[in-house]
A protein has these predicted regions:
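Structural microenvironment flanking redox-active thiols in thiol-disulfide oxidoreductases
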Residues: 36-46
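Hydrophobic beta-strand anchors of alpha/beta hydrolase catalytic cores
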Residues: 2-3, 33, 56
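Structural motif
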Residues: 5, 35-36, 68
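Non-catalytic, surface beta->alpha helical segment in thiol-disulfide oxidoreductase systems
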Residues: 52, 57-85
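Conserved helix-turn-beta segment immediately C-terminal to the redox Cys motif
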Residues: 17-36
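Conserved redox-active cysteine motifs that mediate thiol-disulfide chemistry
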Residues: 5-19
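A short glycine-leucine-enriched loop at secondary-structure breakpoints
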Residues: 47-51
Length: 85
């Protein structure tokens, strides 16, 4: 599962949102994509050590196996995730 931590006021979050929607649709058989509003869920942000938005955590068996901080192009994001799913 890929979880994006985001905020309404975050321009890079708005930029990456459609990319994550595309990835969720294209890889739905192998990857679940979710979003957590960091301003509304500060306890979760703190628990996972999120220091900026957007942050995307890739989870396997409940553990973070990869973290990406900042917006990426679709190609670059998929390249960073390729070894994990």
């Amino acid at each position: 599962m890929l979880v994006e931590f985001w905020a309404d006021w975050c321009p890079p979050c708005k930029m990456i949102a459609p990319i994550l929607e595309e990835i969720a649709a294209e890889y739905r058989d192998r990857l679940t994509v979710g979003k957590i509003n960091g301003d509304e869920h500060t306890d979760i942000v703190t628990r996972y050590g999120v220091m900026g938005f957007p942050t995307m955590n890739l989870y396997r068996d409940g553990e973070v196996v990869h973290r990406i901080v900042g917006a990426r192009s679709k190609r670059r994001l998929l390249a960073e995730l390729a070894d994990h799913f």
